């Protein structure tokens, strides 16, 4: 979903004659496409998004944000697409927002917060590879997971607000086109005032 959103935003930037670039990362910055104008450049961004195969394991959003802050010399609109589940990203995001106009697009998957009643299930952390056996047959287990997820989402929201960035919340089970269009239209109206 993040790749699709990146592609949509790249084409929108090209259509408005805005520069577009990308910074792709895992546990380290792996690929940088410097901002430039034009449909051809936007298509290159999309091609690189589609072809990106991270070499690293895990996510270091904080390092990517620090890199972006150093990379961008002129004030720019920076869109950060992430689930923001990594640690330590809030200060680097606030620093980036001090120099640039930042939009944080959060992507959440309800399957990560609502466990089905499926008995014993082995869960694997996609970033660390750590596995754990969980008995999802108990309501209290499912409730604890749900409550922990809700607390994490609330904490993420507080950090994004403190960083002073615009926020767009998307969900994997809901088509993103309309919420994304509405969010950017509202943002444009607000910035015109």
Tell me what each language-model feature is.
Residues 1-193:
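Exposed, interaction-prone extracellular/peripheral surfaces
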């Amino acid at each position: 979903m993040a790749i699709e959103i990146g592609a949509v935003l790249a084409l929108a930037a090209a259509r408005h004659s805005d520069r577009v670039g990308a910074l792709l990362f895992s546990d380290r910055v792996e690929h940088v496409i410097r901002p430039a104008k034009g449909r051809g450049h936007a298509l290159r961004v999309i091609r690189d998004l589609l072809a990106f195969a991270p070499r690293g394991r895990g996510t270091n959003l904080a390092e990517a944000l620090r890199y972006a802050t150093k990379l961008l010399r002129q004030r720019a609109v920076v869109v950060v697409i992430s689930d923001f589940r990594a640690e330590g990203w809030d200060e680097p995001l606030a620093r980036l927002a001090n120099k640039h106009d930042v939009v944080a697009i959060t992507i959440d998957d309800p399957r990560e917060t609502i466990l089905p009643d499926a008995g014993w299930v082995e869960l694997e952390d996609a970033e660390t590879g750590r596995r754990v056996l969980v008995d999802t047959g108990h309501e209290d287990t499912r409730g604890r997971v749900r409550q922990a997820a809700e607390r994490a989402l609330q904490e993420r929201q507080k950090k994004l607000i403190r960083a002073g960035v615009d926020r767009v919340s998307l969900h994997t089970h809901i088509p993103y086109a309309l919420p994304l269009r509405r969010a950017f239209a509202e943002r444009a109206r607000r910035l015109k005032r």
